[in-house]
């Protein structure tokens, strides 16, 4: 359950409640947190982040660009051009007013 989104700095963070977590699991995470010198909450955040965004993952854009290069759709020069002209600002919500 994600009850709300809190804004912190320039990004939003979610608050997550985990129900029915077995005591053995909570105890193991507490021990793991102590071994890493951080709070249980910080340990859980680290576990979730590593699970959701593992190191070495291939991002979708990079994957699609590699496919295009393999089939001759984009040269390295064209790929660089797209990378340098990409819009990085967040999209604005549509307004019908």
Swiss-Prot record:
Q: Does the keyword Amino-acid biosynthesis apply?
A: no
- Alphabetized UniProt keyword annotations: Plasmid
* A biological-process GO annotation: regulation of DNA-templated transcription
Keyword Ribosomal protein attributed: no
Q: Which Pfam families match?
A: FitA-like_RHH
UniProt function note:
Involved in plasmid stability.
Q: What is this protein called?
A: Plasmid stability protein StbC
Q: Which organism is it from?
A: Pseudomonas syringae pv. tomato (strain ATCC BAA-871 / DC3000)
């Amino acid at each position: 359950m994600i009850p709300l989104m809190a804004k912190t700095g320039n990004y939003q963070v979610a608050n997550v409640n985990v129900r029915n977590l077995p005591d053995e699991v909570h105890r193991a995470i507490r021990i793991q947190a102590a071994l890493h010198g951080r709070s249980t909450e910080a340990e859980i955040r680290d576990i979730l982040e590593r699970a959701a965004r593992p190191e070495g993952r291939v991002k979708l854009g990079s994957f699609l660009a590699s496919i295009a290069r393999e089939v001759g759709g984009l040269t390295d020069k064209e790929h660089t051009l797209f990378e340098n002209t990409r819009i990085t600002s967040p999209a604005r919500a549509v307004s019908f007013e």
